[in-house]
Amino acid sequence: MAEMDPVAEFPQPPGAARWAEVMARFAARLGAQGRRVVLVTSGGTKVPLEARPVRFLDNFSSGRRGATSAEAFLAAGYGVLFLYRARSAFPYAHRFPPQTWLSALRPSGPALSGLLSLEAEENALPGFAEALRSYQEAAAAGTFLAVEFTTLADYLHLLQAAAQALNPLGPSAMFYLAAAVSDFYVPVSEMPEHKIQSSGGPLQITMKMVPKLLSPLVKDWAPKAFIISFKLETDPAIVINRARKALEIYQHQVVVANILESRQSFVFIVTKDSETKLLLSEEEIEKGVEIEEKIVDNLQSRHTAFIGDRN
């Protein structure tokens, strides 16, 4: 008996079929070039509480780790499919908050032929020229595709479509699942149609568990791919055991495990038979090295070995 599709009960987002085609073409083109492709998921999902939603429960995530990791994967030669929360951190752009543009840029002359010329002091936007060049190179090469989600339902459907797009690449596909996905949701059939009124007194909500898509991803959607999940804890004493438990349950390849307070300076790369601590030194922090550079470098080496074992 065929297993039920775990995303079927969630409403399909507008444009999902079109995005599925775009992602499939992106993956097929890069696969034909012999290029590895990574899906980077980034940012948090939100869950509506009403059918015509006004109120939501939101899993907050800035998306910085996903955006910075996407940059590192592009620098390493991967094609990057970036599935991210709308208005969360975007590769390269996240380094330059909007408010800095207002003080850093100024018109350099009258607009000609509909073009506005701007200039900025180099020290007002440090690193901007390099970031712009890197982004434009990826865009010109067609190695970067960004796809937005907002709600949990958006994310689940687009993740499934992305997996189906990358599945034909076999072990050359990587999944880097850094998004902060909601654990609970209200089924559409149980949502009130209109805005929940505060005049009704204290609110009680019964929520269902979100299906763990790591299992169908590993078993059915992309069974030959190299798959990395993330585990964030606040207690250092349990983080490795929790990571190993996830590997045992889902049978994927790697868990990136980290502690809330130190997640930007060290992580553990955990596999079924090893654990590796990646740590930024004080000197590296002063030089602006980011932990995501070390994570991606480590995973790239593991991905190479993974591909070699299957060829």
From Swiss-Prot:
Q: Which UniProt keywords apply?
A: Acetylation, ATP-binding, Cardiomyopathy, Disease variant, Ligase, Nucleotide-binding
Q: Where does the record place the modification N-acetylalanine?
A: A2
Q: Which GO terms describe its cellular component?
A: cytoplasm; cytosol; nucleus
Catalytic activity from the UniProt record: (R)-4'-phosphopantothenate + L-cysteine + ATP = N-[(R)-4-phosphopantothenoyl]-L-cysteine + AMP + diphosphate + H(+); (R)-4'-phosphopantothenate + L-cysteine + CTP = N-[(R)-4-phosphopantothenoyl]-L-cysteine + CMP + diphosphate + H(+)
Top EC group: ligase
Q: Name one Pfam family in it.
A: DFP
Stated EC number for the protein is 6.3.2.51
Entry's Gene Ontology BP terms: acetyl-CoA biosynthetic process; coenzyme A biosynthetic process; heart process
User: Domain of life here?
Assistant: Eukaryota
GO MF terms held by the record = ATP binding; identical protein binding; phosphopantothenate--cysteine ligase activity; protein homodimerization activity
| Annotated metabolic or biological route of this protein | Cofactor biosynthesis; coenzyme A biosynthesis; CoA from (R)-pantothenate: step 2/5
How does this polypeptide assemble, per the annotation? Homodimer.
Q: Which PANTHER family match?
A: CORNICHON-RELATED
Write down the disease named in this UniProt entry.
Cardiomyopathy, dilated, 2C: A form of dilated cardiomyopathy, a disorder characterized by ventricular dilation and impaired systolic function, resulting in congestive heart failure and arrhythmia. Patients are at risk of premature death. CMD2C is an autosomal recessive form with variable severity and age of onset ranging from 2 to 20 years. Death in infancy or early childhood may occur in severely affected children.
Task: Describe the family membership recorded for this protein in Swiss-Prot or TrEMBL.
Answer: Belongs to the PPC synthetase family.
Q: What does this protein do?
A: Catalyzes the second step in the biosynthesis of coenzyme A from vitamin B5, where cysteine is conjugated to 4'-phosphopantothenate to form 4-phosphopantothenoylcysteine. Has a preference for ATP over CTP as a cosubstrate.
Query: What's the protein name?
Result: Phosphopantothenate--cysteine ligase
Q: Identify the species of origin.
A: Homo sapiens
Classification lineage: Eukaryota, Metazoa, Chordata, Craniata, Vertebrata
